[in-house]
């Protein structure tokens, strides 16, 4: 009998495994070193133990085929973003996730794909028949919470691109819409609800919506919800969501093919209230950090116009500051023919005056969004800015998070934000999807409460720190820590 030849373990094979870049290897050839390099390439770090390897391509994920076809063929999302690469495998494995990533990094798809996969894997009989019955029609299978109407509408619009093709009903529950509209939109069954916290609590108390079958919860921009005073509303909503014990003591675990409730949370920062929610509600979450989230944004050039003693931190209109603003806009419009500018102010009155004064100076293509504008006017303004019919959007912080407008070329802080986190969120409107962005911030001594955080942010992020900030008295009282 002839002896079997041993499997080849030549030097060439070993060299291929050790020296070839991960992009030239099949999935089963990936080594621990390859995965480390892959994570470094995409700026992915994690903690929490047993973190699944990131996604290299859409085809390597366990995504239902009809959903995968929509992602790649219909919507043409050809490559996952870093947050999608990191979060989707973890969530598909029914792991709770805390994602810390910049706004504009592709978070929406990072939580929509696992949620839709979960719904599509639900028992077919329940999905096609029982869910539409009287006892279940108003009980969504997934809930997405967002801090603002604008972000909720944006998420709804993205989710409906999938829902319309999959036969799933996605409904938004936000202020500015009548309760009767919600009742009408869920009459034949609702699969996903996208809501702001306050409005959802009202709808739950009125029994318009029930969360008895909602074992999949997503909180987007959770830190922003806390900053806006929604912590109590969040706690109330969480009390309506069924527990893992409830899941396992009923037939629901067989219907939904899960062993635990699933929660995905996305945030730009981890504050004590966020840690409290994570500890009390999430189950052994995996923490994902993308691209040094929370550090200075490398792709945004940050400029500061220091104005010395307090000149413009109130509702009074500062004409000298405005003259500088006009010069900045004029220069930017000369350098960039396809410019889009967002100007932030802290007061509604200042926003309205900015709009009028800019119009007098020839910039008629501007729109305003703030809390006193009706929902219809806000939506119209955002649509006009997104389509480039209007080149300048003037806003209070109601627009600082979540409004996804591609190719914003410049952000101007006419007034520095009162909270430092809001500064990061504001300038994060520009420089999205890897593009270069630029920001200008007017700042004076009335803003000194944020100077220490600003100095730390710039120093830790490797940015040039202005001399006036280094030498300012308010930044001398605390030693910067790495």
UniProtKB/Swiss-Prot annotation:
Signal peptide: none annotated. It is an enzyme of class 3 (hydrolase). Transmembrane segments: none annotated. Coiled coil: none annotated. The keyword Nucleotidyltransferase does not apply. ATP binds at residues 101-108. Residues 321-473 form the Helicase C-terminal domain. A motif (Q motif) lies at residues 56-85. It catalyses: ATP + H2O = ADP + phosphate + H(+). GO terms for molecular function: ATP binding; ATP hydrolysis activity; nucleic acid binding; RNA helicase activity. Its EC number is 3.6.4.13. A motif (DEAD box) lies at residues 220-223. GO terms for biological process: mRNA processing; RNA splicing. It is found in: Cytoplasm; Nucleus. PROSITE patterns: DEAD_ATP_HELICASE (PS00039), HELICASE_ATP_BIND_1 (PS51192), HELICASE_CTER (PS51194), Q_MOTIF (PS51195). Belongs to the DEAD box helicase family. DDX23/PRP28 subfamily. The Q motif is unique to and characteristic of the DEAD box family of RNA helicases and controls ATP binding and hydrolysis. ATP-dependent RNA helicase involved in mRNA splicing. May destabilize the U1/5'-splice site duplex to permit an effective competition for the 5'-splice site by the U6 snRNA, resulting in the switch between U1 and U6 at the 5'-splice site. May also act to unwind the U4/U6 base-pairing interaction in the U4/U6/U5 snRNP, facilitating the first covalent step of splicing. Component of the U5 snRNP complex. This is Pre-mRNA-splicing ATP-dependent RNA helicase PRP28. It comes from Scheffersomyces stipitis (strain ATCC 58785 / CBS 6054 / NBRC 10063 / NRRL Y-11545).
